Amino acid sequence: MTNGSTEDNSYRYTPGLAAKIEAKWQKHWADKGTFNAPNPTGDLAEPGAELPEDRKFIQDMFPYPSGVGLHVGHPLGYIGTDVFARFHRMKGANVLHTLGYDAFGLPAEQYAVQTGTHPRTTTMANIANMERQLGRLGLGHDKRRSFATTDTDYYRWTQWIFLQIYNSWFDPEAKNANGTLGKARPIKELEEKLAAERADWADLSAAEKQEILDSYRLVYRSNSTVNWCPGLGTVLANEEVTAEGRSERGNFPVFRKNLQQWMMRITAYSDRLIDDLEYLDWPEKVKSMQRNWIGRSRGAEVTFDCLGNDIDVFTTRPDTLFGATYMVLAPEHELVDTLVAQSGNSSSGSDAYTDVDPRWTYGQANPAAAVEAYRAAIAAKSDLERQENKEKTGVFLGVYATNPVNGAQVPVFIADYVLTGYGTGAIMAVPAHDSRDFEFATEFGLPIVPVLAPEGAEAGAGEQGGAELTEAFTEDGPHINSNNSDGLELNGLGKAEAIDKAIEWLESKGVGSGKIQYKLRDWLFARQRYWGEPFPIVYDEDGTAHGLPEDMLPVELPEVEDYKPVSFDPDDKDSAPQPPLAKAKDWVEVTLDLGDGEKTYYRDTNVMPQWAGSSWYQLRYIDPNNDNALVDIENERYWVGPREGRPSGGVDLYVGGVEHAVLHLLYARFWHKVLFDLGVVSSFEPYYRLYNQGYIQAYAYTDSRGVYVPAEEVTERDGKFFWVRKADDAEGVTKEEEVFQEYGKMGKSLKNAVSPDEICDDYGADTLRVYEMAMGPLDTSRPWATKDVVGAQRFLQRAWRLAVDENTGKGSVSDDALTDEDLKALHRTIAGVHENYAELRDNTAVAKLIEYVNYLTKTYSAGQAPRAAVEPLVQMLSPVAPHIAEEMWEILGHSEGITYESFPEWDEKWLVDDTIELPVQVMGKLRGRINVAADASREDIEAAALEEPNVASHIEGKTVAKIIVVPGKMVNIVAK
């Protein structure tokens, strides 16, 4: 459908004319390199040019080159950042704004598998299509800086960063350049340190030294519990697993399995990752999400003895130890099998449970059988599903541990809600004061001992056994039932003092110590896929890992015919990963000289996770063609280095969805901090300001089967919705079926996606840009309605007519001077639009532009609007509708483009009202309104208020006792 008028105006702003204008200016910008931002040094520098002090690095989150292309929701953030970038160019800033593609990873690989073509082929085709679609929108990107993570020249440096992290260790005592303790140092320095401090270092074998050094590295191999998905044939990160324990991609079952995997020691940076959030201009919601994910908590590590084995638990409330009546270990805890073997008289845990509550046995005859059955039952549960723990389940191990504060023998269980990666993988359960522990204790008939009482309760309330407790008391209160004969007395104390005393006692007895703990776990950094960055690691005949020297980079991903992952029966939890690269035998086995002669080595057949390429891409945007360094530090310092009031440095504006609030941003911050510690960059944070854009949503429709039907074929009638289409068996005959409306995401699978190509064809790219920016605040979600797009088109048509004669296509303005009313309207618009653009409130900027265009249209007939009123309009319009603004600017006689034209300035005197309206109250009730001069005296205001007819009638016959004048606000008359 085309929304053009049928009037025969050759230069009317129709979709056809818009298309010609947009193609013209997009070619002009590309030919001239209009948006190229110069660097201080290197191949992107402009010799002899003096760079502006004001520079802005504006970055969008990496898009994934999807095979289905874009819908109108995808460009929302890209248009928003383009408006911001164009505005700052007009303010004189050197603006770096570009866009690359995050092209490795499971989505691209699975799409390639589905279509039967190589992932590189489909990925490059998808990128080309996305570039075409985005190109139509007139985004002002410096295309010299664009790349894909799949480019060999790019992932060479991803591999280089991996090696820097691999060849580093974290020294908690070293002061970093930011002045705080803890930093990454080269592993060579650790080797020198150990050689100087350890008398036996010289006597150790090379393998022994290597093993010690490897235990310190920031990248290490570990036997860890991972999410194994047989149906996909790969290990998944936690974020790739749904709450139901299935893969986000493909919806296959996921099982917990112990495998040797590459891990990154992100936990070493826990404190800095939390503390440095204070330097950043991020939404508080995102900061809170990161703090919660890292989960720093202060408490104590306490040791419970169990048959000569130490069970260590971390607790934030050591003051409640007297209420610990049982213990729970993660089913995967390293002590479980040992403790089971020590239960009863057997060496295997096969002795039958004796005098044990049947609820504790999981329906099995002995602890060994119960543990085996329980582990099998929970194998498919995700961490999230386990922590939700809706149904309380567990197994008694047949052993008891000793509570260190009172000597009580407490039963030891395993339960799925305790995870190995959190804390120590074991907890002390205080059911009287923890809801989850209370539910477990109630389910299993365990004792509940209150050790905290509500304020004002009797000291003896809630004797041991807690019979009167119907739920956990989770608030704070004075301690009860909390003393022993060995010097620990907590009764009557508040929380803080009791915690301190408990830790002091534990430390004095050697059964505990104060400690800071974190929920954050090290980063699982390997995938059993083909489409990813190969590891720059080889193994010798003994299986020892060796990082490759830099001159052997990049390790290129081999071109193979069989790139599909080795998948298994989705329910085969006993299967093991077989990475696709293992099939490339000639690539895997190599002869290399790593310093001690040529030897046979074997490449690592895993690939890096998709997060790798997006963890540092902002740095490569700065210096994309540098063959000698990841980034020249002079260029890095210019664009993202520390500035006054911004010691962290970082990208000026980073825009993307809140779904990346934790993982991507956490990983990027971690990598950046390591690079900072190693002197590669001058900034210690990658992104100074973060902005989360909202989403464009849409209505979708389902039939009686719950199947989605095409939204464009649905009509509404009498509050109901009907799918109207041609019947399958009769040409020309329509079939109608009632369907049901739902509101939410836009997407191809929901059959409600609207292509930006369609809107550009029917209305023009500038109309799409204006509509999306006008729909609502950029950081909130909003509903798409194609029928409303025409409003944005009509606004641009009115603006066009103010400057252009629709019959001749020539400029059509007058040289008349502006009236006072014109000046007020103009300067208020300039001030408001300037403020709105600067604060990313583009919807209100568009509203002000519409209001100003309406004012000029009503005030002046065609061709009569003053140039001095129209040209500032075109300048203000340029960031949001750049093509039409460029064309209008040229038609008005300017030979230079508008991109770098200065944004208009306002005069404060035109922002002040000559007169103001004040409400007048009599005895607190509104009785009238008066208009007075803005600078009217108090006496004049009082006189005007008393003369207002309705006010006068309400005080007639009364004595005015007082007149209260609140300047600029109101008048209140007290009359009796």
From Swiss-Prot:
Domain of life: Bacteria
TM stretches of this protein: none
Residues annotated as binding ATP: K748
Catalytic reactions on record: tRNA(Leu) + L-leucine + ATP = L-leucyl-tRNA(Leu) + AMP + diphosphate
Extent of motif 'HIGH' region: 63-74
EC number of this enzyme: 6.1.1.4
UniProtKB keywords: Aminoacyl-tRNA synthetase, ATP-binding, Cytoplasm, Ligase, Nucleotide-binding, Protein biosynthesis
Record GO biological process: leucyl-tRNA aminoacylation
PANTHER family: LEUCINE--TRNA LIGASE, MITOCHONDRIAL, LEUCYL-TRNA SYNTHETASE
Stored InterPro entries: Leu-tRNA-ligase (IPR002302), Leu_tRNA-synth_edit (IPR025709), M/V/L/I-tRNA-synth_anticd-bd (IPR013155), Methionyl/Leucyl_tRNA_Synth (IPR015413), Rossmann-like_a/b/a_fold (IPR014729), tRNAsynth_Ia_anticodon-bd (IPR009080), Val/Leu/Ile-tRNA-synth_edit (IPR009008)
Residues annotated as signal peptide: none
Location(s), subcellular: Cytoplasm
Name of this chain's protein: Leucine--tRNA ligase
Coiled-coil annotated spans: none
UniProt key word rRNA processing: no
Organism for this UniProt entry: Corynebacterium jeikeium (strain K411)
EC primary class: ligase
A GO CC term attached to the entry: cytosol
Residue ranges of the motif 'KMSKS' region: 745-749
Family stated for the protein in its record: Belongs to the class-I aminoacyl-tRNA synthetase family.
GO terms for MF: aminoacyl-tRNA deacylase activity; ATP binding; leucine-tRNA ligase activity
